[in-house]
Each structure stands twice: as structure tokens, then as C-alpha cells.
């Protein structure tokens, strides 16, 4: 454990028993995680200067080990949180840490959590691997992450030539600037600045295990920082591996009797054949301090990355949906954290009447509007619960203080990067604890019914309800005679009453929330106009404030976003149509808007960024052969791909090209703009005409037509 004492750092060591039951707790396939397999994997990862690729093809086991050790440590020495002032109990005879407790008084250094101290690292690497090997590795897995294929090729030793690995690294703190550039990592640096001794010292100690076995340990101790932060945009997992591999080889270059080699294993999205939604860099064991991935190099992004690390004790995002389960508290008889609470929930499910809410097995999704509708007259309002499902989880598991802390912060709008952590937590609950998942769904459905009854009593009709939010109409509140200010007063009273109804429902069930956690219903907006196409597709608009909420138009590309903005600008005209003159004006406006879209598309016809869409790796496996030759650019291919469709000849089918995986200057075939425009205009005109028909009870002759095929010549 890396510990900060004043302005200095030290290392403490603890001997922690980890049960096979706990190791299996974090695994989808528990049969693959056994103590014997874990011991074998650890031995493979403890070779001086090895590539940290033992988890490649075995990431589930290593994630179980990482989470299990973190949880077991807290059982062994006492519950604690990262960056929390602590009092350490050390056995002076063995040299081992045996107890931890919060530093309660100022004299012991107590108080609020302290902040991480970051060193900014930027590292790039060139590893010349065989393109044929990369292609073969990509083809052999269910998914074709090219970053993973590169790691497989590296592990198997398929180098294109004997040219060595080139490495460039810069590490900056407030006190130190360190730089090295190696044309070959086997040779001294040809450019250098600063000294490694300014960053780290080597700490060695002898420990006594089991009362008699002596074991030597050797670790790197940072001098002025406790985490390394890298930008996802510039530092790949392979680059970090190459850097730390050199450090690992140097630290353990001399074999000493009874001194153990530190485990060196990498966890990251590159290990998944289909990539992962969040980029992260997690090393189990060496170098002994975290490497955090920030979304960019801005100060705010760095702070968000450090906050996510601190609030999850380093388990998010590496452990995904399991992270906050490993942070649950231990009861004395538990085999895994939170086991006793889980049993109590199983004993209380009769209160929730599971099985009676089968209409909404994944949470309420309903819409009373059976067809397209254009609505005006009353005020409309939209409401949404904050961190709804994790909050309901805390009704069942109120002792999970680490999850409660994140829910409280998100309720205050802090740390937006943790929103995905909460979404992942509940999304995976049905796999980790199906009874708890079904219980929470039953609770949420019961809340929706109680809430709906309450707002109906106050003259508000819910039009659409989706899981944790809803919108509807205040039938006794006409927007042409009730001011916006008065409508806000009504909406706030309605919000408060609905929230009280929700709290009343859970209280009657016998549940209560942890201190500081609330079931918060938020007013998302007040609107004068509403158009509904379906449960998940609607447009809400306020004529007075110009505020809008447009949900459901496909806007994954720049072209799609431009079309959505164009349609959004037309919908107020649709809502205002009263006679044939208005309809004529609308038709002219639509044609002008469509022509502007075409003109904008023409201006961007050669810009892949405007047309490309983010596509799952598993959905874009047909790749151009040239992509496998693009070296370190492929190390970025561990999440969704930016795909653009190109066509060389009119007679052939469009080809998907992952254009961000090619170096500049890009030499693409002709972007198949018409494929995109045809789909976009089909949706655009369909939604527009359905809204017109709903607004005017018009026949098809009133529909707007714009033959996009007439403009195909512009894009050939």
C-alpha cells in the first residue's frame, strides 16, 4: 500500500487471505476462477521485464483477483477509503500492516479526504508488428479489436523485423520535468532531461510471514506524487506497458535470494475483443501506483479522473459493473462483501410482491398516445428522478456507504464522469444479484403507479413514462392564460407532491435511505407545445423561453445532428399551422431547410468527420486490408469505431472504412454521401409529415416531399 505521511511517501505491506468463494464472486463464469489458476497466473506475471499480458485471454480471472484482494484487504485490516486520513497499526516483529482505523482527531491528522497528487505522463511507442499476424489475431476472436490483435501478435512474438522498440516519455510534476527518447529501448536514451531519482526511490524491506518465513520486497516509491495521469487521446495501453516494462526489468534485474518479483499485469479495454465503452489503464502489482486515463489533458478532465479513482478506491472503471459491489461492507459471517445484506433482502422480497409487475419487467415504459399527436393548449412538464435505480438499491442495501457517497455527489451535479459508473452498476445488477434487480424493478413500478395517482389528483396527465422519468400535460393550466411564472409554481408543487408520494410508497414498504441520500424528482422543463411520435420519440417546446427537448431523432453523425437541428427549427411552424396560408408558408420553409441541408452536405462531402458514425467493433468486422499496416494507430481501436462509408464506383456496394485508424493525409475513396442523405431525409420527412398530419388532420396531399435523389449528381 502506498501511504502518504506529511509530504513524503512510504510503502506498507499486508498479508491478506483471499478465499476461493470471494474470487469467484466477481466472475461471470465462476468455474474458471480457482485458487490454482490464480496462483499459476500470478507466477506467469512475476517475471522480470515481462510484458504484462498474462490477463490477455484471461481478463475475467484477473479482474476477480483485483476486486477480491481489495475487498479482502478491508476485511483483514478494517474498512477504509483511499485518501482518507488513517492511523496504521504495524506489527514491528513482522513488519506487516495489521490494522487501520480512521484518524478521528486533528492530532492524528483526521479530517476530510485529502486530494490525489498527480504527475502528468505522456508516452508514445513504436512496436513494429507483423500485419499478417495482426489480421490473423483479429480474425480469430469474436470481435476484431485491432488493439487486442496487436497485443496478441506482440505476445506471440510476430515482429515484422528485428528493429527494436522506440519509446518517448515525458513526466511532469510541479517540481520535476523528466524526459527520455529512445530510438531503441536496448540502447541508452539519445535525448534526456531530468533524473529518474527525482521521480522515484527504491524501497526495500524484509517481512516475516507466518511467523517464520522471511521475504524480501522491493518497490518503487514516488517522491512527490501518488498517481500518474495520461490523456486517452495521446497515451495507449501498449505505450504505458512498454514504459513500465523497462522499469520492471531494471528494478528486478539482479536476482536476490528470498526477494519476490512484483506481479506485473495489465487490465484495459484492449483485452476485450469488442473493446469497452470507457478507456482505462489498470496495472495489478507493478508499478504500485495508479495510472489514470483522463478524457483529455485539460485540468477539469484530470480532476474528474482522480475523483473517480478516489471515490471507487481504484475499482472503477476497471471492474465495471462489479466495482461498487466489492466496496460493500463486510459483516463478520460474510463470505463476500454484502452477503448478509443480500440475504436480508431475499427475506424481505415478499413485501414487494415480486411477479405482480410483469408488465414492465425492466422498468415502466408506457405511453397513452396511441398515434402521432401534436398538442397545444395546456402547459406540459417533464420530470426525472436523479440516480433513480442506484438510489432504490440503497433502500435495500443502505450500508453500502461508498455507493451512497457517489449517489449524493451525482444528486448535486458533481463528477459527471461517474454517471456512467452508476448506469453500469445497475445495468449489471441482474447478472450479479437477480433478486435485488427484480426487487428494485418492482419498487420502481410501484412508485410509478403511486406517483401517477397523485399527479392525476392534481390535474396532471402523464403522457409518456420511461423508467425514471415522465412528461405530461396539466389539463387545467392553459398556456395562453396562465403565465410562465405561475406555471412554474404549479410545476414545483406537483414535483414536491409526486416526490412525497414516491417516498410514501417506499416508507410503507418498510425501507429507508442512508443519511443524505434522497429520492430526488427534478423538474426538467416547462413547455407550451408537444409532438409525440412514439414512447421514445417526442419534441417539447416552450414558445416563451425557446427551450426545447427533442428526443428520438437519429443524430449519431454530424450530418444527422445538422438534420435534427433543421427539423427542430421547423417543428414550431408545424405546431402553429392554423390555415392553408400557414401550410403554404410551412411548405416553403421546409423546402428552404432541405436545400440548406443539401448545401451543407455538399460543403462537407469530403469531410469524414461530418459523415462518420460511432459503431461497435463487433458490428464493423469487414475492414480494408491496408488498415493492418497502420502501426500504433491501431492501439486506439479498443472502443467504438468511427466508420465512414466510401464507394469507388457506382456499381459497387459501399465499404466501411475506420478512417481514424489511418494516418494523415487521408486518401479515402469517395464518401457515399447519398447513402447517408437518403436515410436521413427518409426519417426527416417521415417525422415532419406525420406531425403535419396529426396537426391538421390533413390528407396525403398536404405532405411535404423533397426528392433527395434529384441531388445525387452533386455527390458523384
From Swiss-Prot:
Superkingdom as given in the UniProt entry: Viruses
Keyword Coiled coil appears in the UniProt entry: no
Annotated transmembrane regions: none
GO terms, biological process: DNA replication; viral genome replication
Gene Ontology molecular function: any one: transferase activity
GO cellular component: host cell nucleus
Keywords, sorted A to Z: DNA replication, Host nucleus, Transferase
Location in or out of the cell: Host nucleus
InterPro entries to which the protein is assigned, alphabetical: HSV_HEPA
Entry keyword annotation includes Ribonucleoprotein: no
Function: Component of the helicase/primase complex. Unwinds the DNA at the replication forks and generates single-stranded DNA for both leading and lagging strand synthesis. The primase synthesizes short RNA primers on the lagging strand that the polymerase presumably elongates using dNTPs. The primase-associated factor has no known catalytic activity in the complex and may serve to facilitate the formation of the replisome by directly interacting with the origin-binding protein and the polymerase.
Subunit structure: Associates with the primase and the helicase to form the helicase-primase complex. Interacts with the origin-binding protein. Interacts with the polymerase catalytic subunit.
Protein family membership: Belongs to the herpesviridae HEPA family.
Protein name: DNA helicase/primase complex-associated protein
Organism: Equine herpesvirus 1 (strain V592)
Organism ancestry: Viruses, Duplodnaviria, Heunggongvirae, Peploviricota, Herviviricetes
Amino acid at each position: 500500500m502506498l501511504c502518504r505521511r506529511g509530504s513524503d511517501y512510504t510503502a506498507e505491506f499486508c498479508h491478506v487471505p483471499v478465499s476461493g468463494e470471494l474470487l469467484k464472486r466477481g466472475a461471470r463464469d465462476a468455474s474458471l476462477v480457482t485458487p490454482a489458476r490464480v496462483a499459476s497466473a500470478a507466477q506467469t506475471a512475476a517475471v522480470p521485464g515481462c510484458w504484462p499480458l498474462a490477463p490477455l485471454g484471461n481478463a475475467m480471472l484477473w479482474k476477480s483477483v483485483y476486486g477480491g484482494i481489495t475487498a479482502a484487504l478491508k476485511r483483514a485490516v478494517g474498512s477504509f477509503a483511499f485518501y482518507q486520513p488513517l492511523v496504521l497499526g504495524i506489527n514491528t516483529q513482522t513488519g506487516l500492516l495489521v490494522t487501520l482505523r480512521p484518524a478521528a482527531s486533528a492530532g492524528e491528522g483526521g479530517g476530510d479526504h485529502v486530494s490525489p497528487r498527480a504527475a502528468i505522463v505522456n508516452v508514445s511507442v513504436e512496436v513494429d508488428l507483423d500485419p499478417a499476424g495482426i489480421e490473423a489475431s483479429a480474425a480469430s476472436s469474436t470481435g476484431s479489436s485491432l488493439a487486442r490483435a496487436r497485443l496478441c501478435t506482440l505476445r506471440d512474438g510476430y515482429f515484422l523485423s528485428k528493429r527494436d522498440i522506440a519509446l518517448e516519455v515525458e513526466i511532469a510534476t510541479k517540481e520535476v520535468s523528466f524526459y527520455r527518447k529512445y530510438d531503441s529501448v536496448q540502447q541508452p536514451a539519445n535525448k534526456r532531461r531530468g533524473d529518474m531519482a527525482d521521480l522515484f526511490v527504491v524501497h526495500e524491506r524484509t517481512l516475516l510471514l507466518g511467523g517464520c518465513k522471511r521475504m524480501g520486497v522491493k518497490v518503487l516509491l514516488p517522491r512527490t506524487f501518488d498517481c500518474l495521469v495520461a490523456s486517452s487521446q495521446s497515451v495507449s495501453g501498449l505505450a504505458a506497458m512498454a514504459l513500465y516494462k523497462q522499469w520492471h526489468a531494471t528494478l528486478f534485474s539482479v536476482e536476490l535470494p528470498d526477494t519476490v518479483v512484483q506481479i506485473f499485469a495489465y487490465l484495459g479495454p484492449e483485452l476485450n475483443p469488442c473493446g469497452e465503452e470507457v478507456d482505462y489503464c489498470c496495472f495489478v502489482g507493478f508499478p504500485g501506483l495508479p495510472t489514470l486515463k483522463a478524457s483529455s489533458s485539460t485540468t477539469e478532465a484530470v480532476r474528474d479522473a482522480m475523483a473517480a479513482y478516489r471515490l471507487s478506491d481504484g475499482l472503477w472503471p476497471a471492474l465495471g459493473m462489479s466495482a461498487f459491489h466489492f466496496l460493500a461492507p463486510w459483516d463478520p459471517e460474510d463470505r463476500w462483501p454484502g452477503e448478509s445484506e443480500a440475504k436480508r433482502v431475499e427475506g424481505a422480497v415478499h413485501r414487494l410482491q415480486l411477479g405482480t409487475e410483469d408488465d414492465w419487467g425492466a422498468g415502466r415504459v408506457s405511453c397513452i398516445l396511441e398515434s402521432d399527436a401534436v398538442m397545444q393548449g395546456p402547459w406540459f412538464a417533464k420530470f426525472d428522478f436523479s440516480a433513480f435505480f442506484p438510489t432504490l438499491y440503497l433502500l435495500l442495501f443502505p450500508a453500502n456507504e461508498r455507493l451512497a457517497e457517489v449517489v449524493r455527489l451525482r444528486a448535486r451535479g458533481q463528477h459527471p464522469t461517474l454517471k456512467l459508473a452508476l448506469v453500469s452498476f445497475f445495468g449489471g445488477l441482474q447478472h450479479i444479484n437477480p433478486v435485488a434487480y427484480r426487487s428494485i424493478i418492482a419498487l420502481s413500478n410501484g412508485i410509478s403507479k403511486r406517483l401517477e395517482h397523485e399527479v392525476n389528483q392534481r390535474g396532471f396527465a402523464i403522457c409518456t413514462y420511461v423508467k425514471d422519468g415522465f412528461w405530461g400535460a396539466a389539463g387545467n393550466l392553459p398556456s395562453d392564460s396562465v403565465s410562465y411564472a405561475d406555471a412554474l409554481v404549479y410545476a414545483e408543487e406537483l414535483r414536491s407532491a409526486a416526490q412525497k408520494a414516491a417516498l410514501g410508497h417506499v416508507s410503507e414498504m418498510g425501507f429507508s435511505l442512508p443519511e443524505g441520500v434522497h429520492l430526488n424528482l427534478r423538474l426538467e422543463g416547462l413547455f407550451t407545445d408537444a409532438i409525440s411520435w412514439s414512447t421514445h420519440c417526442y419534441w417539447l417546446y416552450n414558445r416563451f423561453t425557446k427551450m426545447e427537448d427533442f428526443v428520438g431523432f437519429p443524430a449519431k453523425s454530424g450530418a444527422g445532428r445538422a438534420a435534427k437541428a433543421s427539423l427542430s427549427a421547423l417543428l414550431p411552424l408545424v405546431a402553429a399551422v392554423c390555415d392553408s396560408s400557414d401550410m403554404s408558408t410551412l411548405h416553403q420553409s421546409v423546402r428552404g431547410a432541405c436545400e440548406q441541408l443539401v448545401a451543407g452536405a455538399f460543403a462537407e462531402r469530403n469531410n469524414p468527420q461530418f459523415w462518420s458514425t460511432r459503431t461497435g467493433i463487433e458490428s464493423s468486422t469487414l475492414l480494408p486490408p491496408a488498415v493492418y499496416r497502420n502501426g500504433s494507430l491501431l492501439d486506439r481501436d479498443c472502443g467504438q469505431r468511427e466508420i465512414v462509408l466510401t464507394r469507388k464506383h457506382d456499381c459497387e456496394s459501399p465499404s466501411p472504412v475506420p478512417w481514424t485508424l489511418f494516418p494523415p493525409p487521408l486518401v479515402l475513396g469517395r464518401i457515399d454521401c447519398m447513402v447517408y442523405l437518403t436515410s436521413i431525409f427518409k426519417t426527416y420527412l417521415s417525422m415532419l409529415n406525420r406531425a403535419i398530419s396529426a396537426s391538421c388532420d390533413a390528407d396525403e396531399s398536404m405532405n411535404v416531399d423533397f426528392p433527395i435523389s434529384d441531388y445525387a449528381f452533386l455527390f458523384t
